[in-house]
């Protein structure tokens, strides 16, 4: 097994697509509200294609550091590409679709994670890595859903005293 792992996860959120997209793009809120408890974000100088940020993630006893470039596409989707660090080559695409769940309207968030496999490691640990990535993506989507439905407002900004 070598090549790529591609995982897709859909999550329904009880908010409009504009609010969910604004939430996903608001890195300062993700850092201040500690949406993902094992994650720290720090914005860097913009790269050649758009905003860049550093992501420190704690996994067990070790911390990984990644530099991520964000691309906002014309169709409204957002592409995060990991350009430096332990997860180099990984990309996450977030798409936001208007959806209705019975009597309620909301947003269907479609997350697609693509991870390259190293040739030797892919054969040995490919299935284990796929299960781990699926669990991480599900946890990430649920954290987004809970925080948005808790009452995210796009006007909130961090202010220095």
Positions of PLM-derived features:
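Hydrophobic-ligand binding "helix-grip"
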Residues: 37, 58-108, 114-116
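A conserved amphipathic terminal alpha-helix motif
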Residues: 116-161
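Short, well-structured hydrophobic secondary-structure segments
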Residues: 50-60
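Hydrophobic ligand-binding cavity/cleft-lining segments
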Residues: 1-49
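Hydrophobic pocket/interface hotspot
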Residues: 20-24, 30, 53-55, 70, ...
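Short, surface-exposed, polar/charged, turn-prone segments marking secondary-structure boundaries
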Residues: 35-41, 48-51, 70, 81-83, ...
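Short acidic, gly/pro-rich beta-turn/loop elements at beta-sheet edges
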Residues: 19-21, 32, 63-65, 91-92, ...
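Solvent-exposed residues in well-ordered beta-strands and their adjoining turns
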Residues: 12-16, 97-99, 112-118, 147
């Amino acid at each position: 097994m070598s090549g790529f792992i591609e995982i897709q996860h859909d999550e329904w959120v009880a908010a409009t697509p504009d609010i969910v997209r604004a939430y996903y793009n608001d890195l300062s809120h993700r850092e201040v509200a500690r949406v993902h408890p094992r994650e720290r974000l720090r914005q860097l100088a913009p790269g050649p294609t758009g905003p860049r940020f550093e992501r420190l993630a704690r996994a067990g006893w070790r911390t990984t550091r990644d530099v991520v470039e964000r691309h906002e596409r014309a169709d409204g989707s957002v592409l995060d590409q990991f350009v430096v660090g332990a997860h180099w080559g990984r990309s996450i695409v977030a798409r936001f679709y208007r959806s209705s769940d019975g009597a309620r309207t909301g947003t269907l968030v479609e997350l697609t994670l693509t991870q390259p496999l190293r040739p030797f490691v892919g054969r040995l640990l490919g299935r284990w890595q796929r299960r781990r990535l699926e669990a991480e993506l599900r946890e990430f989507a649920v954290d987004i859903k809970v925080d948005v439905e808790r009452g995210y407002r796009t006007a909130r900004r961090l202010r220095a005293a």
